[in-house]
A protein has these predicted regions:
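Active-site loop segments of alpha/beta catalytic cores
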Residues: 1-189
């Protein structure tokens, strides 16, 4: 969507599907080049972030129609494992995200971790997330981060981590609470 602008992209979903397919063809090849460059240079896995593909902006039927075929191809051509992140509450597309062949999905705090883990694990897909990036990690207390990370683990996340990126000025102490929660959780298991 960034190539033509989010608003234009969303209009094209209805009015210019051929334009959508042309944009996605360009991004498909760029995505394959980027992921394999990373793998050729030692990456263990590659994360694709889809900021405009979530149900808040794109209906699930259009996610399935336009994005799933492209994502499947990008994942198939990857030289290593791929994780797919869809911003916002991605509950409406979790099943489709898992059907792209990814090794993992990354979900935000808005998504239902328990339900999404159940869907993903049934398909052999790992789940990453879902400590809130802005409200908890960036502006919350260390105790809040610890509590939210522990909750994500209790809800079944395979990899406890921020639900989205990490804001550069996030307090280091808050970031360390994710590790502490993980260590404490698994020392009790």
């Amino acid at each position: 969507a960034n190539l033509v602008g989010t608003e234009q992209f969303m209009k094209w979903v209805y009015k210019n599907p051929d334009g959508i397919n042309k944009v996605l063809e360009v991004t498909r090849e760029a995505a394959v080049a980027a992921e394999n460059f990373a793998f050729d240079n030692g990456a263990d896995y590659y994360v694709f972030a889809e900021p405009t593909a979530g149900p808040a902006l794109l209906r699930p039927k259009f996610f399935e129609k336009f994005l799933v075929p492209v994502l499947k191809d990008v994942v198939d051509r990857a030289k290593g494992p791929v994780v797919l992140h869809v911003c916002g509450n991605s509950d409406g597309v979790i099943d489709m995200m898992c059907d792209t062949g990814v090794a993992g999905i990354s979900i935000e705090e808005k998504a239902d971790m328990k339900a999404d883990v159940e869907i993903a694990h049934a398909k052999g897909v790992k789940v990453f997330g879902n400590v809130a990036t802005a409200t908890t990690l960036f502006s919350g207390t260390p105790e809040e981060v610890y509590q939210e990370a522990t909750q994500a683990l209790e809800n079944g996340t395979d990899f406890v981590c921020p639900g989205c990126g990490i804001a550069p000025p996030s307090p280091l102490e808050n970031l360390l609470q994710i590790k502490k929660a993980r260590d404490d959780y698994f020392s009790k298991s």
